């Protein structure tokens, strides 16, 4: 995949145009693991190119599970805001059909994570500190690096580019990224904020 911006990248990244896969469906792919259509493949490619142009893929010093990542807020504050609003208005109501007691409190963070043979190739097993977590495959021209949930015996191998894989963040769904074998993998990680009473 080229990292040179395409002509429509600015419209997609800054204006959130042609970004949304508006198909409304929620599919259970494992115990308490759901897939929801989210972005178009064109939006995924535009976000990859924008992240590469920013060029700030680095682990956060205080992160106990550091990854080579760049926040959407760093790429574009308006992109972060559009994603936060889209998830709250379009995706969260679908999630409430399976988890009726969840409250939307915005995003803790949303970031692009990169796996490459010359840097980070995998991520150790862990669970997140969020209300709900999600992941989007931004590309599929690589081998390995599946997001794996050992307790549920589920991976994201068959989740389409642009779809959101969603799960409860704490305790029950430890996950890891398996070793990358070839290519470069880009993913989008979403951490939904915990309700205030739990912070």
Describe every region a protein language model picked out.
Residues 89-199:
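Catalytic core of non-heme Fe(II) oxygenases with the double-stranded beta-helix
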Residues 6, 10-104:
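Non-heme Fe(II)/2-oxoglutarate
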